Swiss-Prot record:
Annotated Gene Ontology cellular component terms: cytolytic granule; extracellular space; Golgi apparatus; Golgi membrane; mast cell granule; secretory granule; zymogen granule
Biological source species: Rattus norvegicus
Sequence repeats: 90-91, 92-93, 94-95, 96-97, 98-99, 100-101, 102-103, 104-105, 106-107, 108-109, 110-111, 112-113, 114-115, 116-117, 118-119, 120-121, 122-123, 124-125, 126-127, 128-129, 130-131, 132-133, 134-135, 136-137
Location in the cell: Cytoplasmic granule; Cytolytic granule; Secreted, Extracellular space; Golgi apparatus
Name this protein carries in UniProt: Serglycin
Length: 179
């Protein structure tokens, strides 16, 4: 019988231990963290700040994206850090208008009989009107997205209002030609 060198036995034993050890431990847990962007626009600039929550383990059997802001670890770490955006930003407006008009008319008539007579008349009129209106608004159309990310820190941010995004997605690209 041929003898196996000692180095080969050592390599085989090490490979067996590594394969057996990895099958016993299972797959490594995936770690994730919630990341979000908070914006306070002031005219020209968006003034956005990227914020991160604590890390947590993703369970393979469950969905990797939970409902926003329902993770107890996240809520325990940052209980007073969130605010409704519509309280800070609101707007109002007003307007008025007026108008005027005029008109004129004339008429004449004659008649005969045992006597004779004639008549004429004229008239004019004018009118005016006015109106006003007011309104208010808030940034309620901003869509907040919270999503857990894996450890590679790949994050997709969406800075625009939700209704504007829907119309922009259906826009024709410069390369699209309609004949």
């Amino acid at each position: 019988m041929r003898q196996v060198p000692v180095g080969t036995r050592l390599v085989l034993a090490l490979a067996f231990v590594l394969v057996w050890g990895s099958s016993v431990q299972g797959y490594p847990a995936r770690r994730a963290r919630y990341q979000w962007v908070r914006c306070k626009p002031d005219g020209i600039f968006a003034n956005c700040i990227e914020e991160k929550g604590p890390r947590f383990d993703l369970i393979a059997e469950e969905s990797n994206v939970g409902p926003p802001m329902t993770d107890p670890v996240l809520m325990r770490g940052f209980p007073n850090d969130f605010f409704p955006i519509s309280d800070d930003y609101s707007g109002s407006g007003s307007g008025s208008g007026s108008g005027s008009g005029s008109g004129s008319g004339s008429g004449s008539g004659s008649g005969s009989g045992s006597g004779s007579g004639s008549g004429s008349g004229s008239g004019s009129g004018s009118g005016s009107g006015s109106g006003s209106g007011s309104g208010s608004g808030s940034l309620a159309d901003m869509e907040w997205e919270y999503q857990p990310t894996d450890e590679n820190n790949i994050v997709y941010f969406n800075y625009g209002p939700f209704d504007r995004m829907l119309t922009e997605q259906n826009q024709e690209q410069p390369g699209d030609f309609i004949i």
